[in-house]
Amino acid sequence: MAQENHHQAVLNVQDLRKDLQLGEVTVQALRGVTLNVARGEFMGIIGPSGSGKSTLLGLIGGLDNPTSGKVFIDGTDITSMNERALTRIRNEKIGFVFQFFNLIPTLTALENVSLPIQFSRKRRADPGKRAKELLDMLGLGDRFHHRPTQLSGGQQQRVAIARALANDPALILCDEPTGSLDSESSDTVMSALRGVQQEMHTTVIIVTHDPNIASQLDRLVTLVDGHIASDTDPLSTAQQAAVAVLKDKRATGELKQFRGE
């Protein structure tokens, strides 16, 4: 389980709240979320559609501002930062992996991975060398000069993982990283993320609706109606039952109701 002191944790979230204004109606997307995550954890955030999973991930990643509460990354409060400082944090402390890869289509795999290195204050004599090392590590040593359209979905996602690792971030945040992939490619991507966590001791946080993905994670935080309903590692009996139900629903085609936020 994560450390209790935010100075010892790679991530500390304190009483995080987010209100969304929909016309004249105020919706409480997050209602006082508190969370500690230690370095090297491999954890997931699960819950039904509209529970606040992607909202929480966006606030952790500095992509949006909370209504109230704090987010600390490596002991630094990112909620008090201006946009310029946040941009630096996102470049150097946080890696993002999205469902639809978000690679630049006109750039090769090597160029996509090299790009964030070129914008970092951590100067490297040869950004391309670091990019090649990461792509090699992820089994893409023969795909350096391929553009995204020349790669399979699983290969594109591994390029995205390499890009996320480019500046040695404290956190990798993954929003439905296997949501657009078939089961074989999903397994490959999950193996890659697990390898990153084990070999580089990088903290990986995954938002998922997929019960098979959830069952591979070491810790699961369950959100319901914008607050944490459970936080366990390994899976509790209740969560095992929930995963089993999701598997049954997916098998009968009923899992569609759980797709999207």
Regions found by a protein language model. Give the residues of each.
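Pre-NBD coupling/linker segments of ABC/ABC-like ATPases
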Residues: 1-5
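A short, polar/charged loop/turn motif at coil->beta-strand junctions and beta-hairpin connectors
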Residues: 7-10, 252-255
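ABC family nucleotide-binding domain
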Residues: 9-216, 222-223, 228
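Conserved beta-strand-loop-alpha-helix hinge in the C-terminal portion
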Residues: 227-254
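Long, low-complexity, intrinsically disordered segments
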Residues: 255-261
